[in-house]
Structures are given as C-alpha cells and as structure tokens.
Amino acid sequence: MVDLRQNFGISFRELELAVFQKMQEMFVTVMQDVLKELDAAVFRLRKKSRYQVKEVRSGCVATLMGDVEYKRRYYLDKETGEYVFLLDKALDVEAGRVSPGLAIAAAMQAVLGPSYRAARESLKRLYGYQVVSHETIRQLILRLGELIEKEEEKKREEAAGTRKVPVLFVEVDGYWLSMQKGKKRRQEMRMMVAHEGWEARTPSSKEYELVHKTHYLDLDSKDFWEKASRHLYSRYDIDENTMVVINGDRASWIRKGVEYFPNAIYQVDRFHIKRDLRRLLLGTRELKVCLEAADRSDLKTLTSSLAQARDRAKTRIDDLSQFAQIDELLKSIRQMPEAYIDYRVRLAGKGYDVSKMRGMGAAESNVDRFSNRLKKRGQSWSVQGLKAMVQSLVKYFEGKLEHYSKHTSRIHDLLDGAEITKKAVGVARQITSEITGVKQTNVPIMHAGTTRSGGLSRLFHTLSRDRLLTT
C-alpha cells in the first residue's frame, strides 16, 4: 500500500489544493466572460438618449475565488454630466472593492473573530491564500456601519411603527470601552434590548429565547433615551394601552426611560439587587433573610434586615464604608419601593396575565455577547470604528448582517426594459454551462452551517436555488 501511494507521488491534501487552484482559475475565467457578456447586455439595453459610451476601462474586484480583472464601458450621463460604469452600478460593485459574496464572508469573520487581522487569517486558512487584507475588511465594516446607521436614522426620523403589543419589555445596561484618541480614553456604551416576551426554543425545550428582539446601542449619553425610544416607536405603535417595562440597574439615567413612554414602569434588575446584597452583607446573618425577602418582593422584611446590618456596621470603625453603602441602598428602596417589587407582581395587580412572563435580565447576557468582541480582547477603538462594529454586531445578532453585506442597488433606473435582470441571469447561466460543462455539482460547504462557513453555505444554497449550480 505504501508503494502504491509512492507511485502516485501526491497526497490527498496536495491533490485537493491542486484541484482547488484549478477551480479558482476556472472561476476567474468564467467570471471574466460573464462580465463581458453582461457589459454587452447593458450596452444594448441602456437608455441610449441618456448614456453615451466614452471608452472602455479595466477594473478589478476581489472575490471569494481570487481577483477578477475585467473590462467594461465607461459612460457619460448626459442628464447629470457625470461619468459612470453602468455595469458596476447594475451589479452594485465597484472596481477595487470586494464582491458581495466576499463581503458577506469577510463581515461574518470580522464580527465573530477577535480582530480584523484574525478575520483575514481565517479567510486565508479557508482558501489557501490571502483573499483580502485586514485593512480592506476594516473599510468594509466602516461602510457597512455607515449604511446601517443611515437606514436606522431614517426609520427613527419617521417613527411610524405599526406593530401592536400589550406589553413591551425594555432592558437597559451600560459598559465601558477603551478609546484610541481624544480626552476620554474610556467611554460608556449604553445598550437597550427590547422584546415582546419569551418562547421555548423547541416545543419540548426548557430553554427560552426572546421574541422579536431588537437592539439599540449608543455612545451619546445625552440623547440616549431620545434615540432609543424613537427606535422603538419606529417599530411599534406605542400608546397609553402599551405597558412598557424597563429593567436595569440603579443608575439614574436608566430610570429616566419611563418619561419617554405614555405608560411605563421601572424595575431594578433582580440580578443587580442580589449582587449588591451579597457584596454588602457577606458573612452577616441578614444575607439569607434579605435574599429570600427580595425573591418574595417582601420590602418590609428586606428594609428592616438591611437597617439592622447597617446599624451594626456603624458601630465598627472598619465597617464605615460598608455602613455608607448599605445606607445608600436602603434609602433607594425607601425612595422608590415599587421599583424593587417584581414587575410580575405589579402587572398582576393591574389585571395583566403574567402566567407566561419570566424574570428579566437579558441585558446582562447581551452585554457579554457584545463586550466579548468589543472589550474582552484588549482592543481600543476610534469612535467611527466602534460605531461601525456595533452596528454590524447588532445586525449579526438579529440575523440581518448578510442582507446588508450584499446590499444591491436597483438597476431599473439605469436601464430600459424590466427584462434586464432575467436576461442577465440567463447569460450567466449559459456561459457558466458552456465553459464548465458541469451537470451535477455537490459543494460540501453548503452543508457546513452559516456560522461555521462564514455565511458561505447560504450563498451556495442561493446559487443552487437559482440553478447557477445544479445539485
């Protein structure tokens, strides 16, 4: 058997790489021919009275299978006086940039990985060569963030949501990030996670997930609630019949959220209450009593036990700091006692059915998801870079990143004839079929899963569905 392998003179890995390289060469050739035919189609179907050909220019686009150099016509737009590549516009790609397919893969790797360099190396390991530079990936995320922010800002300005829900859950938290420049070397990222409740992951599952979850994150501390509330108003029809439950720690800026909705209540997050009790009462006999009282929303027992612990700490010089902190917590409970009562108890008293409602606290886990990419790996950020990454992460966690990564323009404003899309796809199919001669194709990465494949599995499924690949 060893002799047989030696006679081949090649290992499976070497064979795999050799075949893959040939596929890359074939892909580039096919793409060049397809682009040539599509440019000819654009030339035939353009608005001839508007677009005049001036010359033919070369371009290059980075794709999943390598750089594709191609030539296309350069037009004068007689209406605007500007020059334009109609093919690039029609395909929503610019020479010198990355293809939509590579954009999806790069964006996925950028938000999942620890850094842009790690994203570059991940793609390099997958394809066997450097597909794209880390700076190109960074620029991609910046453009992606700008695109998302413009769309979200437009929605906030309109603020005409139509979805109606009886109860809207709003969970808020903040965390600090390291910045690269400016007077503030650390800035607080404020985050809102809103949802409509909980549902089991599967019919028999004991694990739950949030229903219609949406995020809003901002570095602008002054206008946080103004923008965050409009984010919700752009999605929901919120009126006096909509109960908005705001959950968060004892920070004063979180409590202000109730002022932005007609009917809202604020609850101090149960996790934060218990964390403070454990920290302040560690080693005291009041700890267990206070924890149990907090679970029952028994404020009378909670405050009396806290008072006992505070008074005892006051008598010891080494516990004066503890005394002050317990006293501050006690004053907070007495000033806004309703905020320390479980929201379900309060809603039940108002006639709401709370049987399917669960304890709140999603903001804490979502902070971990975001901070894992933004702060736990030692990064420091520019304001622009941070905002772009945050927008990309939001869309990733909401399952919408791929949509924005492959964002396409409308070509009907540029070309005559609604049949252009159908004809373009037909040309692509015909050329691909003629050059490759492939009748049956099975691409393993189609079955690798979206996260594992960096979004490529969904891309290949789309190609298969459109019959660009026959499986």
Segment roles from a protein language model:
Residues 26-44:
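N-terminal "assembly arms/tails" that initiate or stabilize quaternary assembly
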Residues 42-73:
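N-terminal juxtadomain amphipathic helix
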Residues 1-32, 74-471:
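Catalytic center-proximal scaffold of phosphoryl-transfer enzymes
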